[in-house]
Amino acid sequence: MKTLTDSFVYLGHWPSAGSFGFNTDILATNPINLSVVFGVLIFFGKGVLNDLLDNRKQRILNTIRNSEELREGAIQQLENALARLRKVETEADQFRVNGYSEIEREKLNLINSTYKTLKQLENYKNETILFEQQRTINQVRERVFQQALQGAIGTLNSCLSNELHLRTINANIGMFGTMKEITD
């Protein structure tokens, strides 16, 4: 290894008068040496640089293509999610409207049912009151009739004698006989 570096050092010490050689002293470089170095770099580095740039370009294009595919997939998923959201919102609105309608219908049914029940109870109450009034009236009539009958019997028994009683009976029998003849 030492001989290799020594050979480069010897190259740097060649006489520079009228000959072509490499100047290894960076501070003492001239335009010719620089152009040779740049020429070698461009000639050999061009292919490597082109390959690097082509690879980089291909990776960037692949990344862009993948990003576009992912974007399209994301857009499709977003559209699907929005469609599902609209569908769910529509169904929720329908459930809400149907729920409110059902609640209103049940409320009206309950009110109507309660009204009918109250009406029936009112009718039963009125019928019961009417029945109790009739029964009370009949009881009062029966008592009044019994008292009047007892009073009349008492009056008749005290006022009528046997002879008057027999004449009244005979007159009534005569009236019944006359009525029978008229109807025949």
Swiss-Prot record:
GO MF terms held by the record: proton-transporting ATP synthase activity, rotational mechanism
GO cellular component, one term: chloroplast thylakoid membrane
Keyword Transmembrane helix: yes
Subcellular locations according to the entry: Plastid, Chloroplast thylakoid membrane
Coarse class of the protein's main subcellular location: plastid
Entries under CDD domains matching the protein: ATP-synt_Fo_b
One Pfam match: ATP-synt_B
The protein, known as: ATP synthase subunit b, chloroplastic
Source organism of this protein record: Olimarabidopsis pumila (Dwarf rocket)
Gene (UniProt): atpF
